[in-house]
Design a protein with these regions (language model features):
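Conserved, carboxylate-rich catalytic/transport cores that coordinate ions
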Residues: 1-172
Length: 172
């Protein structure tokens, strides 16, 4: 696997990073549910020395992302449960908790470092860019939102924070 070793400030800024190859050896075999139960209960638990600072990092990175106005997309993942014969018995929704989000937030930070590394070192790479709506589509959106008593800020170029604010108003 490839490791992205990062130094992150208490303000959530990535100060430095390096990439290097490694072999992953998972001795603990933890589940998201186990980790979340330990974090919620507090006290003493296995691997606390590793999990507690990682959870604090997650909280810092999440707060930083919210301040930037990043959109939160909550989706329901599913899990297949199999019978003894190996056939699908049923499909159930996976309940996401902060242990899931902790891993996702760290992966996002590593992806940002990877993109920066590729750009800084002038490596050819594909990036997925999310273009904003055309002026016509933006006008139509604003018209429809107005009918619902809603407003999208940001003038001609709404930022992700403007969209996140709107999404929050809709959710409430």
């Amino acid at each position: 696997c490839m490791v992205c070793d990062m130094v992150v400030t208490y303000a959530g800024n990535i100060k430095e990073y390096k990439f290097y190859p490694a072999v992953m050896r998972s001795h603990a075999r933890l589940t998201y549910t186990q980790v979340w139960n330990w974090i919620e209960k507090g006290g003493d638990y296995p691997h606390k020395a590793q999990i507690e600072p990682l959870y604090k990092l997650f909280q810092i990175l999440q707060k930083k992302r919210q301040q930037r106005g990043a959109m939160e997309f909550e989706s329901t993942e599913t899990q297949m449960l199999f019978d003894d014969g190996g056939k699908i018995e049923r499909i159930v929704p996976v309940v996401r908790n902060d242990a899931h989000k902790l891993i996702e937030e760290c992966m996002l930070a590593a992806n940002v470092c990877a993109a920066e590394f590729l750009l800084k070192n002038k490596h050819t790479a594909l990036f997925r860019n999310h273009l904003g709506p055309t002026p016509e589509k933006l006008a139509t959106l604003r018209e429809q939102l107005g009918l619902l008593g809603l407003h999208l800020g940001g003038g001609d170029k709404p930022t992700p924070k403007d969209y996140a604010t709107l999404a929050e108003k809709i959710a409430n």
